[in-house]
């Protein structure tokens, strides 16, 4: 049984020292697409965290009963089932956001973070540790999404969560929104800048030269 210290390390590690986007550079595609607004970034974070945590839990519970030859198929079946549930919940209770997220909720099925944690961690680790690892990786993914979404929505549209923060010139204010920040390529450069800042502050995260 895992103790509290181990659980804390498993939960906080992916957020601080082993971030799936900043260190491992996984899950970047969806990060480029859903970060033009804080609302979509937050919902995507919750969706991926729920799927990653629950898939880790169920796969870990079944790990001793899954034949090695079909383990990837079983993992994808479990992940796909959870994604369908999440997608249906979003369409029922947050339809407008679900429309904005479009296919990217469905693409959680093939998200590198979810698949990677299922194969590399949940298949070898007890259920509670696997569940916390899923939450940690989801929150680590979300930390980058929300950071990028904050910059893109605030300076690209002058608002946060749809609430005007910077009064726009078109409405008689002073701020001229930077429309470039609302385009997907801007997220690529922002994520790159974040990774550069993190690796400057933490040199140990820089890959060793071969």
Swiss-Prot record:
Top-level taxonomy: Bacteria, Pseudomonadati, Pseudomonadota, Gammaproteobacteria, Alteromonadales
EC number: 7.2.1.1
MF GO annotations: oxidoreductase activity, acting on NAD(P)H, quinone or similar compound as acceptor
Function: NQR complex catalyzes the reduction of ubiquinone-1 to ubiquinol by two successive reactions, coupled with the transport of Na(+) ions from the cytoplasm to the periplasm. NqrA to NqrE are probably involved in the second step, the conversion of ubisemiquinone to ubiquinol.
Enzyme class: translocase
GO biological process: sodium ion transport
Keyword Signal: no
Name of the protein: Na(+)-translocating NADH-quinone reductase subunit D
Entry membrane topology: Multi-pass membrane protein
Pfam family, one: Rnf-Nqr
């Amino acid at each position: 049984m895992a103790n509290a210290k181990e659980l804390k390390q498993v939960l906080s590690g992916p957020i601080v020292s082993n971030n799936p986007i900043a260190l491992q550079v996984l899950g970047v595609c969806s990060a480029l697409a859903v970060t033009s607004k804080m609302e979509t970034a937050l919902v995507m974070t919750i969706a991926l965290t729920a799927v990653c945590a629950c898939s880790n839990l169920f796969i870990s519970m079944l790990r001793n009963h899954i034949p090695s030859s079909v383990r990837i198929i079983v993992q994808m079946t479990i992940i796909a089932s959870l994604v369908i549930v999440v997608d249906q919940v979003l369409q029922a209770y947050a339809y407008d956001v679900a429309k904005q997220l479009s296919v990217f909720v469905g693409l959680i099925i093939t998200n590198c973070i979810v698949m990677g944690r299922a194969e590399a961690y949940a298949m070898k680790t007890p259920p509670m540790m696997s569940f916390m690892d899923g939450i940690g990786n989801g929150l680590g993914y979300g930390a980058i999404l929300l950071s990028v979404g904050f910059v893109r929505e605030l300076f690209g549209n002058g608002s946060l969560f749809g609430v005007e923060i910077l009064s726009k010139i078109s409405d008689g204010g002073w701020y001229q929104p930077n429309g470039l920040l609302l385009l997907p390529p801007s997220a690529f450069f922002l994520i790159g800048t974040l990774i550069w800042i993190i690796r400057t502050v933490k040199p140990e995260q820089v890959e060793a030269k071969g």
